[in-house]
A protein has these predicted regions:
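Intrinsically disordered, compositionally biased charged tails
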Residues: 1-25
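Intein/HINT protein-splicing elements and their conserved insertion hotspots or analogous self-processing inserts
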Residues: 21-64
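Generic C-terminus detector
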Residues: 32, 40, 340, 353-355, ...
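Active-site phosphate/pyrophosphate-binding segments
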Residues: 58-62, 66-94, 184-313, 387-406
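Extended hydrophobic-aromatic, low-complexity segments
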Residues: 64, 104-106, 121-122, 151-154, ...
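Glycine-rich phosphate-binding loops that contact phosphosugars or nucleotide phosphates
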Residues: 88-237, 317-360, 381, 389
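Short, conserved micro-motifs enriched in small and acidic residues
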Residues: 99-103, 199-206, 271, 275, ...
Length: 406
């Protein structure tokens, strides 16, 4: 027994030496993020559904996204490190996103190309990451995600960075994975969005796209001082104009009561109206489960018009001045084949009343900003149709708020 004691002593000494040799663990420094959200924003506050609450919160959400970024009549994007020289050296812009955020990207393509004269390509994130994209160090990739955790969008971001591109993200959730992985991030101050079908996050993403487009156009010298001032004035008026549309929501509710039993509903438009048609169609089908498709109005004659029959509802968006007559011509085509038409247009286009069965009017604004107004009656229409059908509006079947799987 006494002989075992020296052995134990040796083992204890060795253990002590090993402990001494163990490297010190580095202290993990956690990054702190301040999320300026009120608890009441995550409560229904008397509304039957979060979706309607969030639709009605859009004037405030847009205003909150604009106000810190317009100072003394100029757009100030302190969020990003892009210099004037960086902007001038951009070869091409890619906008990559999924779902409604992708539809924001389609609007972004029209607006940025028109205002900045830089080529823009829009791609669904799940396609971008696998298509061996031709993107490099002179390109800017804009990724859009409400949650900042969308799996396909995050993977597309990583693909873009691996190829040397600069990545700017538009995100709602502070400190999210996409925000942290980007070179620059612009946050949309929409607040928490609980309903699966996005409304206010979509609208604030649009707002950020407008700000980016005007900011870059100014740096590139593609916009006059007068045009720039007018554009900013119109951006600042968007919250009030959205609120004005919301005051007439009962008119849209009436239309929903006439069409909630439809089996198929088609949305058509040209240019920016086509981009909003995509969102209107998605909003309707994801919460009401009615089959719906959106088409560029000029494509009707290339196949889609064969689906039109007596009683088919066609929602025709015609807000742009230059293309109004073209879209009216398409309305006449579907009417001749038995369609019922709900037109969405601006107050100045009185001729729509003569050709459509029903008309929804929105206030006039700068042509590039019209999507922010056109989408509101489409959100309301989708909501009221789903409500009349008794659907689970806030949590539609088979859908998730944040898609974190591929």
């Amino acid at each position: 027994a006494p002989a075992a004691e020296p052995v134990k002593a040796q083992e204890s000494a060795k253990a002590a030496e090993i402990k001494k040799e163990e490297p010190k663990k580095e202290e993990v420094k956690k990054e702190k993020f301040t999320v300026d959200w009120d608890v009441s924003a995550a409560e229904k506050g008397g509304y039957e559904h979060f979706m309607m609450k969030e639709i009605e919160e859009q004037p405030k959400a847009i205003r909150d996204t604009i106000s810190p970024r317009i100072k003394d009549g100029k757009i100030v994007l302190d969020d990003i490190s892009l210099t004037e020289e960086d902007i001038k050296n951009i070869n091409k812009i890619y906008i990559v996103a999924c779902g409604s955020a992708y539809h924001v990207g389609v609007v972004g393509k029209y607006v940025i190309e028109k205002m900045c004269r830089i080529p823009v390509e829009v791609q669904v994130a799940s396609e971008f990451r696998y298509c061996d994209p031709i993107v490099g160090k002179d390109d800017l990739v804009i990724v859009i995600s409400q949650s900042g955790e969308t799996a396909d969008t995050k993977a597309a971001l990583e693909e873009a960075k691996a190829r040397g591109a600069r990545v700017l993200s538009i995100v709602n959730v502070v400190g999210s994975a996409i925000a942290k992985a980007s070179d620059d991030v612009i946050y949309t101050w929409a607040g928490p969005e609980i309903a699966v079908a996005t409304t206010k996050a979509y609208s604030t993403q649009l707002t950020v796209i407008y700000l980016i487009a005007a900011y870059m156009a100014d740096k590139l010298g593609k916009i006059s001082k007068e045009e720039y001032a007018d554009f900013i004035k119109e951006i600042e008026s968007l919250p009030d104009k959205v609120a004005e549309i919301l005051k007439s929501k009962e008119d849209v509710q009436y239309l929903a009561s006439k069409f909630y039993n439809c089996h198929s509903i088609f949305f058509i438009g040209r240019n920016l109206d086509y981009a909003v048609s995509l969102e209107g169609s998605l909003k309707l089908k994801e919460i009401s489960y009615i089959h719906s498709e959106a088409y560029a109005a000029g494509e009707l004659k290339h196949g889609t018009i064969s689906l039109i029959e007596d009683g088919t509802l066609v929602v025709a968006l015609a807000t742009g001045k230059n293309l109004f007559d073209k879209t009216v011509s398409n309305v006449k085509e579907v009417k001749a084949r038995g369609a019922v038409v709900m037109g969405v247009t601006t107050e100045e286009h009185e001729h729509m009343d003569d050709v459509a069965d029903y008309t929804v009017k929105i206030p006039a604004t700068h042509e590039m900003l019209l999507p922010s107004l056109t989408v509101i009656p489409l959100q309301l229409f989708g909501y009221y149709v789903a409500s009349l059908k008794g659907c689970d509006i806030d949590k539609p079947r088979n859908l998730a708020k944040s898609v974190t799987v591929e």
